[in-house]
């Protein structure tokens, strides 16, 4: 075993990572099928070829599996470090893309394909970290586990949630690194910024259902179900959200430059939700013939709440805003767990911060919260410090690829992310880091 850091040919590593990601995104693991048998086999083959033990966990749903790889410490002095990513991806319509979304095309310095950023790129960064630890004979002070899950894009019923509920003893980590935050370039006056998520917004999904007497479309009236529903929706969507700073976002604003940073956050679509609860109208239905005013109509809303928002008080406020006996407010989903914010002093956060600044010395590393949902919440709910960061440095144009058209990961960011995760892992799990 070696106790110092061997020299690494990062050009060769970058080429290998690019090839791996190109092959990985060629495997269609999109929903609604969300099959991960082939993706797990792809990762397991690369790990096993270099003597890294893997185990595949078959979930109760056919075609959906989770993969665990482990590098064991001879004399562990702490619980494992867990590197997490998900193998499933959202759908893509090939006709709308520059390249086929499952081609893995490498062009213009990017790997194109659905999942290249969310979240197969992260998976390859973690794969390369495991391979480098093994190849370089790094002596470990704790086990390092790589977890690749299914079902993250639909709430993880057969993925991280199922693993935590049924196989937690096989993981039992001290710290978890997952997706949820990113490095951003060109967003802040303060310069490059790595936003490390230490918590995430919680989700409440509600449905407004309007009921009234039906009738002929030639004779509309004020209290028709569709009219009631539209008025209720306007009331809800027009309500100004109250801005407030959670502790993590307050620290973020401080590190990025105070009030200037607050204005920058508030002006950007991707970061504005950090400051308040959000309500998005996502589904509408009602009616069955164009000349009939229906007796029922409904709208569904995806609501994302700041970690300190009381979800029942939030729903109660929605009911007061709607205030129409002909419109009911139904809760489709409550948050799965209470919010648990990871600390941003010491531990894995400090290791991430040091690693990021090793490669980008002038960058700002700051805690933040994830405005979406990730697998990390299932580990945070167990009290495990869990951090989200895909450690590339992304532009606004890059970030459009998340669930969007022409999703792509730059070769440069794949390299940077691998360097940062490997460096972080050495700081957390190597007996000697130099």
Predicted feature descriptions by range:
Residues 66-70, 176, 207:
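Conserved hydrophobic/aromatic beta-strand scaffold that supports enzyme active sites
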Residues 111, 117-195:
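Acidic/histidine-rich catalytic neighborhood of metal-dependent amide-processing enzymes
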Residues 50-52, 79-80, 142, 171-174, ...:
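Loop/turn elements at helix/coil->beta-strand transitions in domains of secreted/extracellular proteins
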Residues 1-5, 12, 60, 182-190, ...:
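Metal-dependent amide/peptide-bond hydrolase catalytic core
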Residues 84-86, 148, 178-179, 209-211, ...:
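Short beta-strand segments
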Residues 65-68, 110, 115-116, 182, ...:
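Cysteine-centered functional microenvironments
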Residues 2-114, 135-142:
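Acidic/His- and Gly-rich active-site-bordering loop/insert found
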């Amino acid at each position: 075993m070696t106790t110092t850091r061997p020299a690494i040919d990062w050009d060769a590593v970058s080429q290998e990572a690019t090839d791996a990601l190109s092959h990985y995104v060629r495997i269609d693991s999109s929903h609604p099928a969300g099959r991960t048998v082939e993706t797990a086999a792809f990762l397991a083959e690369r790990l096993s070829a270099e003597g890294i033990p893997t185990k595949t966990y078959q979930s109760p749903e056919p075609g959906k599996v989770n993969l665990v790889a482990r590098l064991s410490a001879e004399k562990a002095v702490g619980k494992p470090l867990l590197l997490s990513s998900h193998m499933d991806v959202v759908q893509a319509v090939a006709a709308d893309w520059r390249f086929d979304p499952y081609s893995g095309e490498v062009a213009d310095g990017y790997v194109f394909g659905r999942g290249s950023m969310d979240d197969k790129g992260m998976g390859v960064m973690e794969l390369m970290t495991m391979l480098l630890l093994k190849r370089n004979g790094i002596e470990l002070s704790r086990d390092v586990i790589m977890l690749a899950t299914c079902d993250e894009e639909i709430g993880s019923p057969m993925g991280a949630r199922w693993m935590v509920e049924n196989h937690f003893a096989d993981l039992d980590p001290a710290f978890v690194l997952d997706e949820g935050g990113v490095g951003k370039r060109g967003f802040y006056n303060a310069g490059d910024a790595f936003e490390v998520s230490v918590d995430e917004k919680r989700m409440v999904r509600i449905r407004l259902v309007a009921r009234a007497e039906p009738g002929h479309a030639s004779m509309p009236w004020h209290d028709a179900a569709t009219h009631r529903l539209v008025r209720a929706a306007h009331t809800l969507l027009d309500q100004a959200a109250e801005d407030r700073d959670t502790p993590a976002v307050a620290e973020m604003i401080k590190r990025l430059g105070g009030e200037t940073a607050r204005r920058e956050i508030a002006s950007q679509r991707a970061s504005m939700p950090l400051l308040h609860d959000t309500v998005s109208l996502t589904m509408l239905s009602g009616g069955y013939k164009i000349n009939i005013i229906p007796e029922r109509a409904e709208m569904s809303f995806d609501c994302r709440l700041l970690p300190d928002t009381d979800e029942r008080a939030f729903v109660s406020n929605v009911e007061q805003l709607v205030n129409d006996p002909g419109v009911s407010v139904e809760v489709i989903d409550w948050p799965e767990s209470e919010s648990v914010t990871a600390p941003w002093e010491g531990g894995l956060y400090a290791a991430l911060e040091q690693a990021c600044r090793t490669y980008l010395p002038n960058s700002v590393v700051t805690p933040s919260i994830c405005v979406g949902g990730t697998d990390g919440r299932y580990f945070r709910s167990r009290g495990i410090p869990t951090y989200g960061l895909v450690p590339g440095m992304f532009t606004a144009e890059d970030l459009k690829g998340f669930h969007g058209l022409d999703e792509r990961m730059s070769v440069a960011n794949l390299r940077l992310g691998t360097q940062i995760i490997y460096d972080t892992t050495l700081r957390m799990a190597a007996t000697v880091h130099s």
